[in-house]
Structures are given as structure tokens and as C-alpha cells.
């Protein structure tokens, strides 16, 4: 990396002229910190909004422009529809004209539902279900023979194979698992002269009134005939089957009394095994529908089973040394678990101090899986005396699995889930569907095999698949849609993904690009897209594909507003808006707007200073040598990692890089962090799979700083999260006035009764429900928004009340509490990470992702470190302007200079060039990634 800034030539142009007939005009925007902003934006262009973190970019793009576009659309709906959609508050703006319907694409909406896959998220799977339903060839799931249509004679022959004198009834399934009262079908059955009907397994006489619940799925079967197998029944049976087929669109059910029911279809059946396949419908291929989902795993493809290795993670320990780490089975003196362990030890020859590795095979099996029918002697002691009784022992693992199934407590489920692992379903082998659905093929492969191919392979298959001329004509429109959507995924660099990949396992960059590809596939025009930092998590190579995708969306006739700090995106944009000049109260203005050249000319634009090369992040003259010790992850094989062994040298700033999907988060977050957290911090998270992590003796603690919010309610704020508010409350309780009144620290909390205003319960605002209008938030009439009651506000420190302190910015509070070291140190760290502009009492819900992450970083910086701490940060430059990145790098340097180790997953070149050591994973994403990293150059990645 060069030690001098690269100055890309800025195209010199006059100020961009905006067509007055094709523009978006914003007047008087005052949302959050915006200062009465007036702005004109060109329509049908790629617009980038940039500026320091907290400058007001998101307030303008999302909370003003997008919010108003969405609100206007919702207000056009009926009041009946609006009650299900919730209300959107009108942004604080005088007027916006030229708006289109708005769609937001951010990274916070990745699905964590285990049923969501790449195929379902992109809606490609819906087209595949239709394709297999229309041109699929059914086969017998047992013998694999192609299934053809059945005639009435073949159905009669199959029924006549039943033993002599077998009683059965012929049913016509007119409704199958469908919501509604089914009154129309029941009336039709009455008019046709039928006497009985079976509804949801219960028999009814059609002469009586049958009332069915409207919102529950029902199955309705008309009883056509009741028969007994004998030599004379064949003719009547044939007539009854024909009648049932006519009533139920080619389906008939033979309900054998005391036996298994038989279903026949005029459509398809295997003559050898008698397996009938009903008419192929799209729902047969849905793993989210009972008609298609595997019955054993209900369409998940996996089972959660208790893992013995997680129940006893370290067999070198004894039971008394807490070898058993499972909910309800921790060792404690006087507990039922201790009594059970003693009884098992007496029977199988071990004590509470015997290491588990020395247990006999029989003893370990009894401990984990129970004693079966054998009763063992239990000795129970209590304050009322002792007693002996004999009882069977269920076993730790069966006990945990039973409690997991039966409990209604989410907390208990989460506790037990810590010792469970996911196993492939033995029935469908992870394919999610019923055998009959998996036995349908197109071009020789079933739908699960198709989805297991990569996007690139699927495109090749569709282009070369051999189908009949008739099927080709029927499937042509479906092939076209599938090919287009697969092509869009390939064009955004996701050709390595499979459609069966779980959506929850996707990285932020992958999920963002999938949603972009889906929008291109929808081919909408005249839409306003608002994107939140789409380059987050993207390697420079992937970024080029992303920019091309956004341009393609623009070329369809849409307007794109992108909140972004990436330099390449800015240089490729049609129009740039720089919000600033500073952050918080120092921002909220339009510093510059126009082309890159226009931005570079504006002296007060910090963005312009970096784009023009006047400012830059320096490359260090020397690299740190570290302390000579290292953490080593041996043979990591979680997700796509290919048994790689990686060294993390201690005492250095380490960057883990690689293209999107190459395995960075798996290696660092899932394996290294979770293993260290379990060993050093006592965390109970489940680490990813590797042989061992060596070198943990050189580290005393690990701290992970992720991108999740610091709180989800307005009551959470930076002061409460960092703990500084506790110190401030203690300070107020130590004032002379507070002592005279007998006030403790709790009096100054707005979350508990005593000192808070009870009218608003310490919130400072009241919510007024307006039903079909947005809720209105007004300051509390009693406390005037100050959160506390009058008596509490009479206590002051340096002429400031506790409410005044919450309203201070970090910058102001640093000066105010300069003489209180405990408070000043915590506030100073907030200032160091660039959060001097936020208020101490600012609601967590109003903080951006970048701000929330830096609050966490400041919180960790304020703690005392020993110089042997490992800090792990995932994309710390998220939401950061290059000026903020400059400041962040200095903070990270400070941590490493104190002897600590900082490991960052990062694509930002300004951070990478400051690293002492670089680990580059790849070479590709998905199955093409996870390969052993190349050894760094002699100077540690310069």
C-alpha cells in the first residue's frame, strides 16, 4: 500500500443543473438535528448522501424523504387496511414535492427464520414449485418407476386385494385442509342426495346443521358408500368409486375400518407398490406447507438433539468440579442432582471426585441415557430427616430433550439449546420435503437436487435440460423468469450461492445484494429506492458489482438515494449531497451538493478534503513486532472453512479480509471469539467447529464488539449503557441536600418509583393514540419532559439538576465533571470515539448503527485492561465517514500500544493499511472460499 494518498482526478465541471420538471424538492426539513434544510435532488439518478456519523444523513434520507414517501402511500389505503399496517409519523418537514413510492433496502432486515432460504427470499423457489407442478414427472418413491394415470378398474383391483369381509367406506374428499365454513360444498352434497359427511375425522349427518369455524382449516369428505369385501361387491364398488371421483375432481379415499386408508387418483399411481400420487400442485413442493413438508422434521431439514460433548465439555473434570454443564444438572451440595449422582456412583462405581474420563462405559451411558427399567437406590436427606427409596433414572439427555419439547418457557428452551446441536433429519436427509415430492423430476433431477446446485450450475442446467416439446412450450414462461432471476444473482456476484442456503447464514453484504437483485427482477420503474450503506461488508471487488447493480436499477427509470461513505460509490454517483459540517448539533446542514468536483471545491466540506487528497489516513512508518506469542485456530471446519489452521499473533492490530462469503465471520466470530469467551469469560455460547484453539493461556479476557443496538427502548441511553449514569446518581445522592432529605442513588433513577415523575413514569413524554392518525408524542404536562418529580429536581450539583445533566452533550459533560475522575474517564472515552455531540440521555432508539457500536467501544475502553486482552470488532467502520475512520484508527492504536491485541474484520483500505498483520481468506465466496490464507509478507502485511 502506498504511503502517499492517491489523488484520483476529479472531473472539472460546472455546477450540475437539475431539470425543474424532474426533481425532488425538500423544504424546511427539521427532523432530529436537521436545521431547516432546503434541498433539490434530480430524479432518476444515483444520489449519494454522505457526511460524518451523526451529521444528519440518515435523518434526511430515511427519516424525512423515505418516511414521507411511505406515509403518503399508506394514507392512500383504506382505514381498514391501515389498522393492520400500523401508523407512520409525519416527518418534521414543511413540504416535499416530486416524491415517488419509496422502498427501503437496508441490512437490518435479514431473515433469521430457519425456514427462509435464498430461494424463498428471492422468490425463485416459487417459480420452481410452479415448474415442477406443471412439467414435473412423478416417480414411485420406492422403486423409482415413472408413475402414470390410474383407471377405475385398476383402483377396484387394488381395493379387492383387501382380506375377505373387510369393512370400508368410499369417501369423496371435496375439501382438503382449506379455511372457511365450507357451506357451499355441504349444500352441494345435500342437493346431490348424500346422507353423511366426514369433517376433520368426525362423522356428521347431512340432515343436521353443520357449523364450521371460519378461520380454521377443514377437510370435508362425502361418504359415498359403505361396503364389505366379498365376491359380489366389485360392480357396486366401481360405481361408487366413479361417483366419488366425479365429486372430488378425480380423487377417492377408501377408509378401511381398523386399517390404513387408501387414496387413489385418476392422475398418477405406481402399479407395483400401489402408491398413488395426487395431481401435482405447487404446494406439494413447499416445505412450509403440510402437503409438501417432510413429516418428521416438518420441513426444517434438521433436528435439534442434545450433544453429549456439550453436556460434558471437559471429561478431565469430576462431577464436583462441575464437569456437567446442562440446565438443571449443575452440581450443588444438597441438591437433587447431587443425590442422583451419589446414587449412580454407588451403583456404577464412581465418586463425585472421579474424573469423567475414568468412568466405565456402562456408568457414562447410565449417567447420560438413564438406567432403563432398573431402579436404583436413592438416599434423600433434608432438614426433616433422611429416607431411602428406589427409582428409575431417566438420564440427563432424555430429561433435557423431554423438557425442551414440553416447556412453554422461552428461557428454559434457550438454556437447554446451549447443549444441543443441529442434526440432519434421518427421513428426508436435510431435503425438507416428503418422499412423494422428492420423487418428481424435471430433466432427471428433483427440486431439492436443483436447489443444492450453485446459481452458476443452475443456469447451465436450465439452458441444457432436455424436456419434451410439449413441456418446453408449457414451461417456457417459467424458464424465462427463473433464468432472469438467477442471472440477476450472478450479476451481483452471488453465483456461488445455492438456493437451499439458509437466509440466516448469509452475511450482511450477501443479503443486501440479494434484495437488490430481487428489486431488479421486479423491474419496477418510477420508484424511489433508499439504501443504507450497501457497501458494508463488501470486498473492493464485490463493490464494483454492487455499483453496477445500482446503476442498472437507476437505468430502469428509478431514483436511488444511497447513504454511503465509500469513495468508489461517491465517484460513480450522478449527484452527491454532503451533510455536515460536523456531527450532532454541529451538523444538520447541507455543506455541498453536486458532482465530486463541486464537493472538492468547498473548503468547509470534510468529505471534499479527503476526496481531493488534502487530508488522508497515513500509513505507519513501522509495524509493531508483537509479543512473540500467538493464538492458533487448528483445523477450523465450520460452514465453508476447509480444515484451515490460522495464527493470530498477539500484541498486534490484525485485519481479517476476504471477499464476501469467504468465511471471515465464521473464523473470527463463530470459532475464535466464542471459544475464547467460553474459556475465559465463562460464556455459554456454542463455538464453531475446530480441532482446538491453542495459546489461550497468553490471554486473560476477550471482548467482542458487534453491530447490534445498545437498547430497543427509549429508556436505554448512552449514560445507562456505559454505567456512567450510576456514578452520576451516586454523586447527586452524596450532595448535602440529598443527604438531608435521605435520598439514595435510586431516587435519581427514572426507571423506578420514588424520584421519577409518575405521570409519564420517567419517560418525559406521553403517547396519545390517534387511532387512524399517527400517534402523537407530547412532553409530559406534569414534569415538562424532565422525567423527575419536583422534589428530586430540587437537588442540584453545581447548579444543575439530574435532568439538566441528561440533556448535556458528552462534550459539555466532560467539562462539567472534569474533577470527578471516575465519571470523567468514562465520558472521555465517548469523546475519543467521536461521540462528543450525542446527549447523555439520548434514546438508544435514535442512535445510528455506527453510533451504537462506538458507544460499546467506548464502554470497553473505559474498563481497566491488563495488556492481555483480545478485542474483536466486526466491521468497526460501519457508518463511519473517512474522518471518523481516522479517529477510530487512533483509538485502536491506543489499545494495541497498551499491549492488547485487536482483531478486526474489515474491508476499509484505510484500516487495512494501518494493520500489523493481515489474514486474507478466499479466494472466492461460498464453496469457493474458506481455503487456508496465504502467509503474510515478511513485514506483516505491508
Sequence positions of predicted segments:
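Conserved phosphate-binding elements of NTP-dependent enzyme cores
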Residues: 1-942
